[in-house]
């Protein structure tokens, strides 16, 4: 046992991911070459989607709006000619941001400017500004084209269109106000640079760059002081710190295409569970006969309980063969998706790693979980090593939460974030509906905030 503790402690220290608990304003020198991780400020409260309805069988269905989405209410304000000209100049160059000038009625705005101040100019300029602000802030892609999209973006609440237009007109700085809406992540800037250097004749590549730039706009602009972001097609998870600096990457195994595809989420790490248990889904207990088999011949590592209705509950106990491995990073959500260790570590060596039932198996999950617990629960490394090696179920709640983004980018920087833009296989075929929406005229925005697809919670999320 002491040898195992020493090995885990050594692995954790060498990884460079361990961080001594300290005040956020002071950075202590480190002896390891890994980047220093600063303690985050408390994460902003997430915006929660409406409660999910259920199917007739009682299984929860996620992503069906309770009310019909309505068109957004766009303001109309008085526009001086000079500010309208500044808006037109932005529209004329907006293709550098991966959008289309024609979407924002430049010819109508040009004609209204020529006619001079008045209601016509106010109406046209207000509409053009609102549409442009919405697309720069929230993305051009309509919700119906965002497959399995359940990451509610709060930016329209933080920077509403009315406030943006008021600011632009009060400061007479239309271009500056709109520029503040662009994503700040380095991947967005790398894609923007790639778009600028890709020949116009290469329409397929330019279209792919555009939709992946737009995917960054789907996410909240402020991703957090410290956050985790998984890119499903890349099979990678990144731990990021202030100003989008890369701390460490982790290989992942994600959901198989089809019903068990991993959805796109924005959640928070709320706890780290050492030596987790796993409640075996009924599809295995009943469908594969595991419950009856264990009743006939009990097996070490499984606890079977007969319920009052005669059904069986099977719980796999903590241990080296537990399906969740030695650690689970809990990010509560209606989909039962989380990050976890796995005893099947051979999958991390495969180039294509879409093998799970939805959850994200994470290489070196113990290192990641300990890092989260040190930063989020102020626990000393020695205690965490003891938790990990005890073999006992131990849940460590976070006093500081960390955002987790489960994203889907088919183009972006390479894994090391060196600035080189690479493509990833569209394993779930989610590009097609976004590309189709970009090939059509811009759709009017509605109040819908997530995908309307019915998604039944997976009964076996591993």
Tell me what each language-model feature is.
Residues 1-24:
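Sec-dependent N-terminal signal peptides
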Residues 2, 47, 123, 130, ...:
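Well-ordered beta-sheet/strand-loop patches within structured domains
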Residues 5, 23, 29-32, 300, ...:
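Positively charged, low-complexity intrinsically disordered regions
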Residues 22-25, 29-34, 457-462:
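Peripheral peptide segments
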Residues 26-154:
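Cationic-aromatic interfacial patches
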Residues 136, 168-169:
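Hydrophobic residues in alpha-helical segments
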